[in-house]
Amino acid sequence: MIQATIRRSHDKGILSFEMTGHANFAEHGQDLVCAGVTAVVFGAVNAVIVLAGFEPLLDIGEDGGYFYFEFPESLDPEARQKAQLLIEGMIVSLETIERDYKDNLRVTTNII
């Protein structure tokens, strides 16, 4: 199962997110849940880089099964606002996948 953990501040702003595990919906290369989650996450992160104009802190597992995104502490408020909206859209998409594939994806939020 893919575990997606969203970390938010007390004011509900996104601080970071982490993805771990594998969907195990189908064989490697044929797993639609994995492909959907990967497309949503990489699409959102690429949009942040291009449209918000900054490089987030990223850690991507070499063999798959791990992805970490964190907002830099010093970030222009306008860029942060744009990126927050893009990542919120990613979360909506992940939760939509989770509704149909509960055994393969779990999205949780932690307030820190």
UniProtKB/Swiss-Prot annotation:
Main enzyme class = hydrolase
InterPro entries cross-referenced by the UniProt entry: Peptidase_Prp, Peptidase_Prp_sf
**Signal peptide (UniProt feature, chain positions):** none
What UniProt keywords apply to this chain's record, in alphabetical order?
Hydrolase, Protease, Ribosome biogenesis, Thiol protease
Query: Could you confirm whether the keyword Hydrolase appears in this record?
Result: yes
State which Enzyme Commission number(s) the record gives: 3.4.22.-
Q: Which domain of life is it from?
A: Bacteria
> From its record, what is one biological process in GO terms?
ribosome biogenesis
Residues that span the membrane, as ranges: none
Q: What does this protein do?
A: An essential cysteine protease that cleaves the N-terminus from ribosomal protein bL27.
Q: What is the protein name for this chain? A: Ribosomal processing cysteine protease Prp
The gene that this protein is the product of is prp
